């Protein structure tokens, strides 16, 4: 797949890159998911692959790290599966990195892909690095904005 950005790259760099958050709807023309949820879940069962499950119930968040043996216990709501460096393990996903090669290599890390059921997510947080989020299959409510004071929560010392 040849993914094409719909944005004007020089304008994006000048106006937004490392300056402020922005949502660009339909930022990739004719987007097709390069990996299915089942394939992603399969990767998260491999020892070499960095993955985690984030779930919440009654305001309590919990994270567990892969590899995972089963997903049967999770139910149909309030959890997300996140898999790091998918581009290193699944060749078709590597094509998603190509449109961003205008950035220097040292700015590019990996392609993390997540799958969420209704109510799933990772909760409000600040990333300490620049992130491009590409919404694939499904629906999601994204909220982005300027940095605001947040209470630090470290459930896993």
Language-model region placement:
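Active-site region of the double-stranded beta-helix
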Residues: 1-15, 28-35, 41-157
